[in-house]
């Protein structure tokens, strides 16, 4: 109980400080998106969170708005990303709105990464139920592994076969090791990664 309360207070304070501290990046992101492709600033993705409950995860929008089933809407997602969208994805600005999820309690700073419905359907039984006992996180040990190995693989099928299973195992491991000091250690590790190579994909 002490850990849960401490973690929630820590998450709320960090998210609030994070939003204030990164406010210039929010302004740049909002203006850049509106200039690139007029429409909603935020993109909401349905993800599975704690106790296998769905929630809306926020991101800055990086793809063009599709209003009808035109030829453009049938293109692969990669073709719909506008140039500024590529930039905010590369430097991770698109992830900043997830600080709002941390404020409202649907996410934490450190924890298993939230998964999409199709991924949840693949891993919903067994160990996944263990990972679902804690709040999903902005980052965590699986993100660190993905940074080291996942970024080297472009093919999605190869990624799902070689990287994703180990990544899921690390999510389960987090549940067993979860604690305030372990969370702080992960924050230090991930911060060092962002500082040393800020333009690489971390999560």
Sequence positions of predicted segments:
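Soluble non-cytosolic domains of exported or imported proteins
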Residues: 78, 90-94, 178
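Positions in alpha-helical segments
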Residues: 15, 43, 82-86, 118, ...
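A hydrophobic, helix-centered structural microdomain
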Residues: 1-65, 176-196, 200-201
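Short, glycine-rich, amphipathic interfacial segments at transmembrane boundaries or analogous
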Residues: 43-80, 141-169
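Short, conserved beta-strand/loop elements in beta-sheet-dominated catalytic cores
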Residues: 86-108
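Hydrophobic structural segments characteristic of membrane proteins
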Residues: 100-196, 200-201
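Short, well-ordered beta-strand elements within core beta-sheets of diverse protein domains
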Residues: 84-91, 172-176
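Juxtamembrane loop-helix boundary motifs flanking transmembrane segments in multi-pass membrane proteins
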Residues: 1-5, 76-80, 95
């Amino acid at each position: 109980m002490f850990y849960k309360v401490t973690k929630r207070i820590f998450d709320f304070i960090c998210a609030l400080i994070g939003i204030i501290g990164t406010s210039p990046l929010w302004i740049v992101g909002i203006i850049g998106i509106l200039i690139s492709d007029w429409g909603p600033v935020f993109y909401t993705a349905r993800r599975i969170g704690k106790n296998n409950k769905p929630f809306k995860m926020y991101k800055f929008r990086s793809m063009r708005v599709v209003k009808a089933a035109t030829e453009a809407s049938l293109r692969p997602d990669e073709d719909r990303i506008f140039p500024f969208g590529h930039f905010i994805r590369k430097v991770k600005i698109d992830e900043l709105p997830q600080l709002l999820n941390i404020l409202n309690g649907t996410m934490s700073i450190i924890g298993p990464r939230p998964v999409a419905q199709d991924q949840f359907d693949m891993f919903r039984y067994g160990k996944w139920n263990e990972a679902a006992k804690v709040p999903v996180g902005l980052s965590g040990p699986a993100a660190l592994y993905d940074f080291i190995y996942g970024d080297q693989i472009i093919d999605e099928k190869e990624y799902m076969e070689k990287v994703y299973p180990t990544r899921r195992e690390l999510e389960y491991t987090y549940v067993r090791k979860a604690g305030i000091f372990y969370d702080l250690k992960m924050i230090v590790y991930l911060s060092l990664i962002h500082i040393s190579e800020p333009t690489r994909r971390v999560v």
